[in-house]
Amino acid sequence: MSALRSVAGLLQRWLLPARPAGLYDRQLVVLALALMAVGLVIVASASIPEGIAINNDPFMFVKRHGLFLVMALGISWFVLQVPMARWQHYNGPMLVLAILMLVLVLLVGRSVNGSIRWLPLGPFNLQPAEFGKLALFVYLAGYLVRRQSEVRERFIGFMKPMAVLFVVAILLLAQPDLGSVVVMFVTSLGMLFLAGARLGQFIGLILVGVSAVVTLVIAEPYRMRRVTSFLDPWADPFGSGYQLTQSLMAFGRGSWFGEGLGNSIQKMEYLPEAHTDFVFAILGEELGYAGVLGALFLIFALSFKALKLGHQALVAERLYEGYLAIGIGIWFSFQTFVNVGAASGMMPTKGLTLPLVSYGGSSLIIMMVAVSMLVRIDFELRQASAQARVREVS
């Protein structure tokens, strides 16, 4: 018990340190870079067979992933220079741009596996849904500041952002992309609840949302197959349950400490999407449950610090920054829950990436932009606190 208390104390001191005099929270940066490093290593291992099969180049995907990392870091550096007041001021145009991109992808987008989710930009493919997530949360944080009393006191104030979400959801479902819709819905509900929306409205919308998801699943045979295969994948291990059974076999082979980095069998064309949606299964096979717990701790710590930062911003009466930071924390944690749940058989597959780990340029860049926003929020809070102390002294 004393050892457990020591570990708990160590984690508490690391996750909840006294705010240092530095310019920003270095732990946020370290956590994000650590996740990106884990992703680079696992993508490099998981994508080798796919790269050979497509282009006879075992490092095809890891070279692209490395380029995405460089782009993500470069764009993040630019985002760090942008004051949060700018994001608050331009949240409306940002959402309009996201909606226009979602319309454009339906008109000229690239179809992959029956889904039209990508805009071809030369050698790159842009996924507007990823930008749409961030744009919606940036807009919703601004709305909650502008209409806080209306959200709390009037039903129409609660429903206006839900109407915006409905428009975005219709465009996403036309691709189709139910996974992104679910992430947006859950994150938006969390932000509205923390802004003081009435519990009855909140519960009613949850029931409507669950009913809508059930209807969408029943209406599409491929979604119904995903649900039935999730409930009993071994009933059709070479058909609808194939991907999940292969993923479960990867976790089983990994056991506690894994087969060793690069020694995965399931990535050898057995497990589809091994370097994207199911990269977590390959991580489990090669690094075992120890590696799984390590990766989950990094994501948990990043999400926890985002939520804690949001709380600090709300206490400091910086409402926009507080709502946005909390939204980012909910987004990261829920998307991780869905991705890990799909890979481990706890949830139907949704086609969502593991934050900062899975292969995918759009997801990686947008999530690093979100992390940069968190760092900027922390910087501005520290700056305001330092200025307040100077005024007190003078």
Curated annotation (Swiss-Prot):
Q: What does this protein do?
A: Peptidoglycan polymerase that is essential for cell division.
Q: Which organism is it from?
A: Aeromonas salmonicida (strain A449)
Cytoplasmic-side stretches of the chain, per the record, are 1-27, 86-88, 145-154, 198, 301-322, 376-394
Source species taxonomy: Bacteria, Pseudomonadati, Pseudomonadota, Gammaproteobacteria, Aeromonadales
Q: In which pathway does it act?
A: Cell wall biogenesis; peptidoglycan biosynthesis
Q: What family classification does the UniProt entry report for this protein?
A: Belongs to the SEDS family. FtsW subfamily.
Q: Cite a single GO BP annotation.
A: regulation of cell shape
Q: What is its main location?
A: membrane
| Record keywords | Cell cycle, Cell division, Cell inner membrane, Cell membrane, Cell shape, Cell wall biogenesis/degradation, Glycosyltransferase, Membrane, Peptidoglycan synthesis, Transferase, Transmembrane, Transmembrane helix
Q: Which GO cellular component does the record give, naming just one?
A: plasma membrane
Gene symbol?
A: ftsW
Reactions mediated catalytically: [GlcNAc-(1->4)-Mur2Ac(oyl-L-Ala-gamma-D-Glu-L-Lys-D-Ala-D-Ala)](n)-di-trans,octa-cis-undecaprenyl diphosphate + beta-D-GlcNAc-(1->4)-Mur2Ac(oyl-L-Ala-gamma-D-Glu-L-Lys-D-Ala-D-Ala)-di-trans,octa-cis-undecaprenyl diphosphate = [GlcNAc-(1->4)-Mur2Ac(oyl-L-Ala-gamma-D-Glu-L-Lys-D-Ala-D-Ala)](n+1)-di-trans,octa-cis-undecaprenyl diphosphate + di-trans,octa-cis-undecaprenyl diphosphate + H(+)
Q: What is its EC number?
A: 2.4.99.28
Keyword Transmembrane annotated:
yes
* Topology of the protein relative to the lipid bilayer: Multi-pass membrane protein
Q: Which residues cross the membrane?
A: 28-48, 65-85, 89-109, 124-144, 155-175, 177-197, 199-219, 280-300, 323-343, 355-375
Q: Which GO terms describe its molecular function?
A: lipid-linked peptidoglycan transporter activity; peptidoglycan glycosyltransferase activity
> Which named protein is this?
Probable peptidoglycan glycosyltransferase FtsW
Q: Which residues lie on this side of the membrane: Periplasmic?
A: 49-64, 110-123, 176, 220-279, 344-354
Where in or outside the cell it occurs: the entry states:
Cell inner membrane
Top EC class of this enzyme? transferase
- InterPro entries the UniProt entry points to: Cell_cycle_FtsW-rel_CS, FtsW, FtsW/RodA
